[in-house]
């Protein structure tokens, strides 16, 4: 690995109200960049890796230093441009423009392959930004806990009469994203068995209470699951092993889970999925010396993994892809029916997207957990009738360990995001919280992503691969005055399979911030309602009408009806 991608340095975001930069609008991206590399947050901070295989916050350490320096000196009417983790320019704009514009991992479609990206990465010309790694709004595994929880709850509604009590989930992967699964299953009332090939990841999840127990062997794991499901207890169990070995063995034994999914880093066969029979150190070494052979070995193991998932599905076990592109990898290795089980979005989440409901998150720049608890109470006050959301917030406070700066996520839609943002801004203005709040989201949202094997799989009108929508989302958030806006390629499912956009806005208590919040936190989720209404989803059309969206072609269609 080039020396510039490794540095033995501990990064933590500043806390409190003393500014390092010239304003909160530049202090916020500075702190969030640093927070992404906090050792309590990032998977491999010394190599700038935040999560998701090689999802980085900056291209190399020289670029990181230059970004920090640029943000520290950035004026209130300037915008910093980031190209794949490298600061390439500072331009005069205006005080309502974004302070940072980010483009990560974007390639011309014909060249949008892992092979070409890896060549560029080796030359120091590109960086994989994943979704929230390179856009500086990762908050640790909490960032995906509620989405996973909502998925499991909906699966319980659809398949098990509304409850997962006495049921168990079989899955794999305890990295930055997959680490949310055991806690989400527990919160949804289910037991879970999660296979993870790296002991260090299991140790981290045990320490942060995302996993309850570790089993010594497969027999031990199954005995624990049998006991806990019989007793109606929701306990999460981890097993250090390779999913490509364990799932076929479970099929051979005739073991029948109640739900099956997967969140290994299968999207990145060179760095994220350990081939069967290999040690992790061997995998890393071979990735450097024989990348093609390593990728093929990983994909062969993925094929075995998916064949086992297909076998569970054929038994009648609800089985779904959780968005890591493992079905595609298996299909490329000859598993022609790899897509016989669905992805999680068309199976469970799309009705939420139709109403602009998605992963709304916020972070207390003060570093004070009390600021988050106060905002939790404000959410309950404003969204007073949503008891499901209140239950989530109560469970989150009890069970979720803050990683880095205190943060919260809750899935809310078009109707509420603007109201919550304005309320948080008012809390900052009147001193109810001790420092500004930043509001952002995952790129996995209703209007900000095109990903035919994940968020836009099986769209009603066949527009799965149309990527105009995330581009429009990024452009609109820029025009609306988000504090920083990002446009990425390849997040979640790997090179060539997705394009997606993100935004973050600062609540600093000023009237100017309130005006920006009104625009951004309405327009951003509204693009999701627009996208789904355009695709012909009645629920989205109804939401658009209720919220007064001006969608010319949808209005014309409604008029004809």
UniProtKB/Swiss-Prot annotation:
Pathway the protein contributes to: Amino-acid degradation; L-histidine degradation into L-glutamate; N-formimidoyl-L-glutamate from L-histidine: step 2/3
EC number(s) given by UniProt: 4.2.1.49
Cellular localization per UniProt: Cytoplasm
Cofactor(s), names only, from the UniProt record: NAD(+)
Entries under Pfam families matching the protein: Urocanase, Urocanase_C, Urocanase_N
GO terms under cellular component: cytoplasm
Alphabetically ordered keywords of this record: Cytoplasm, Histidine metabolism, Lyase, NAD
GO biological process, any: L-histidine catabolic process to glutamate and formate
UniProt similarity note: Belongs to the urocanase family.
The protein, known as: Urocanate hydratase
Organism: Salmonella paratyphi B (strain ATCC BAA-1250 / SPB7)
């Amino acid at each position: 690995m080039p020396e510039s991608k490794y540095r033995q340095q501990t990064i933590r975001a500043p806390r409190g109200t003393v500014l390092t930069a010239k304003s909160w609008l530049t202090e916020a991206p500075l702190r969030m960049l640093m927070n992404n590399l906090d050792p309590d947050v990032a998977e491999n901070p010394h190599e700038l890796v935040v999560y998701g295989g090689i999802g980085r916050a900056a291209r190399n350490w020289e670029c990181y230093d230059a970004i920090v320096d640029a943000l520290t000196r950035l004026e209130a009417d300037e915008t910093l441009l980031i190209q794949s983790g490298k600061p390439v320019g500072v331009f005069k704009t205006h005080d309502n423009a974004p302070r940072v514009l980010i483009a990560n991992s974007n390639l011309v479609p014909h060249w949008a392959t892992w092979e070409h990206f890896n060549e560029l990465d080796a030359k120091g010309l590109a960086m994989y930004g994943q979704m929230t790694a390179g856009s500086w709004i990762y908050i640790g595994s909490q960032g995906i806990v509620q989405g996973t929880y909502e998925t499991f709850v909906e699966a319980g509604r659809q398949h098990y009469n509304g409850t997962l009590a006495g049921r168990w989930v079989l899955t794999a992967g305890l990295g930055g994203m997959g680490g949310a699964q055991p806690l989400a299953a527990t919160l949804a009332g289910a037991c879970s068995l999660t296979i993870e090939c790296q002991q260090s990841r299991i140790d981290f999840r045990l320490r942060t209470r995302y996993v309850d127990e570790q089993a010594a062997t497969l027999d031990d794991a199954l005995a624990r699951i049998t006991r806990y499901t019989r007793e109606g207890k929701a306990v999460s169990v981890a097993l250090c092993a390779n999913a490509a070995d364990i799932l076929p063995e479970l099929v051979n034994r005739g073991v029948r889970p109640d739900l099956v999914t997967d969140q290994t880093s299968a999207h990145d066969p060179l760095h994220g999925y350990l081939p069967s029979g290999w040690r992790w150190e061997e995998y890393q070494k071979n990735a450097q010396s024989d990348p093609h052979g390593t990728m093929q070995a990983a994909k062969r193991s993925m094929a075995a993994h998916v064949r086992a998932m297909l076998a569970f599905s054929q038994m009648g076990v609800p089985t779904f892809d959780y968005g890591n592109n493992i079905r595609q990898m298996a299909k490329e290795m000859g598993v022609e029916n790899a897509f016989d089980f669905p992805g999680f979005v068309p199976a469970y989440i799309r009705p939420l997207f139709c109403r602009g409901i998605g992963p709304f998150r916020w972070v207390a720049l003060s570093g004070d957990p009390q600021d988050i608890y106060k905002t939790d109470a404000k959410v309950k006050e404003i969204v007073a009738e949503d008891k499901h959301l209140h239950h989530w917030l109560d469970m989150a406070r009890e069970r979720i360990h803050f990683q880095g700066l205190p943060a919260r996520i809750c899935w809310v839609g078009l109707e509420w995001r603007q109201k919550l943002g304005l309320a948080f801004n008012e809390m900052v203005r009147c001193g109810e919280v001790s420092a500004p709040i930043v509001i952002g989201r995952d790129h996995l949202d209703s209007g900000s992503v095109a990903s035919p094997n994940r968020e836009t799989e099986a769209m009603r009108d066949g527009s799965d691969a149309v990527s105009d929508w995330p581009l429009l989302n990024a452009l609109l958030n820029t025009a609306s005055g988000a504090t920083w806006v990002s446009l990425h390629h390849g997040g979640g499912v790997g090179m060539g399979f997705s394009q997606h956009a993100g935004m973050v806005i600062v609540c600093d208590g000023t009237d100017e911030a309130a005006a920006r919040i009104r625009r951004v936190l309405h327009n951003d989720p509204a693009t999701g309602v627009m996208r789904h209404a355009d695709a012909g989803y009645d629920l989205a059309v109804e939401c658009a009408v209720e919220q007064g969206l001006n969608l010319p072609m949808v209005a014309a269609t409604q008029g004809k009806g």
